[in-house]
Regions:
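Glycine-rich phosphate/adenylate-binding loop
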Residues: 2, 110-113, 121, 125-126, ...
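N-terminal charged helix/coil linker that caps or initiates catalytic domains
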Residues: 1-26
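Conserved N-terminal Rossmann-fold NAD(P)-binding element of oxidoreductases
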Residues: 27-29, 52
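Hydrophobic/small residue at the entry helix of a nucleotide-binding pocket
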Residues: 33-34
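Glycine-rich phosphate-binding loop and adjoining beta1-alpha1-beta2 segment
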Residues: 46, 51-89
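Conserved SAM/SAH-binding loop
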Residues: 97-106
């Protein structure tokens, strides 16, 4: 019987693949970073995915988001990317949630047990609460710290928040997390200085500007995050088997 994950199993082994099939990963935010993270997860054989975003596919998403096609314009991002996942792996268990993660309604998003969380949310207040909630509940979490206005994907790094530098969002997150008593959490960040940009659209409520974004930087960041989750889950299974 053919196995679509055979090439992955050659690296991660049968035990690693079994661990992935039994794993439940939640991805919060399905934009340029989150959509590529989902792609890495589903193509690697993760068995259960919760996909969370409150937005719909818009024309300006076509330059960087995997669920964004002319045929999906106006559809919910969560449902659109879930359809893509089903086509990649019909056996995957999917929970698309159309909604925005906020502290006031967090329990809606935690009615299932997650083995890993990928935080690809834009809003700082929501990121802070999600990180605190995950750490309090003992759920591994990896957070994206912004890929907008960046040109060079080779500068992307996954490290502890305490080791970040040169990133304005990382600076804000370090300060706000410290105020909550959190000094350590895993993040994806880039020290690259933001590129000069020209504003072409009005910012949504609560934001001062719309960040420019390219295909390859958020895409590479999302693949890195998805890959990190896959390797962590497979590695943990090997350690538990010893």
């Amino acid at each position: 019987m053919e196995n679509q994950f055979l090439r992955t199993e050659m690296v991660l082994g049968a035990d690693g693949m079994d661990a992935l099939r039994r794993s439940h990963v939640a991805v919060f935010g399905l934009g340029g970073v989150g959509s590529y993270a989902v792609e890495a997860l589903v193509r690697s054989g993760v068995g259960e995915l919760t996909l969370i975003d409150d937005d719909t596919v818009a024309l300006t998403n076509l330059n960087r988001q995997l669920e964004a096609l002319h045929s999906t314009l106006g559809q919910s991002k969560a449902e659109a990317i879930a359809a893509r996942c089903r086509d990649i792996n019909p056996a995957v268990v999917l929970h698309p949630i159309v909604g925005r993660y906020e502290a006031a309604g967090r329990e809606r998003f935690f009615d299932a047990k997650y083995d890993y969380i990928l935080d690809c949310i834009d809003l700082v207040s929501c990121k802070l609460d999600l990180i605190e909630t995950a750490l309090t509940r003992g759920i591994p979490i990896l957070s994206a710290l912004g890929t907008g206005n960046k040109l060079d994907p080779s500068q992307l790094q996954i490290t502890d928040i305490s080791k970040t530098y040169g990133c304005p969002l990382a600076r804000v997150m370090r300060k706000e997390l410290k105020a909550r008593g959190i000094l350590h959490t895993r993040v994806l960040f880039s020290p690259e200085l933001p590129a000069a940009t020209e504003q072409k659209e009005a910012p949504p409520p609560g934001r001062r500007s719309v960040p420019a974004s390219l295909t390859w930087v958020p895409g590479c960041g999302g693949l890195m995050m998805g890959g990190e989750a896959v390797l962590d889950l497979a590695r943990r299974a090997k350690e538990e088997a010893k």
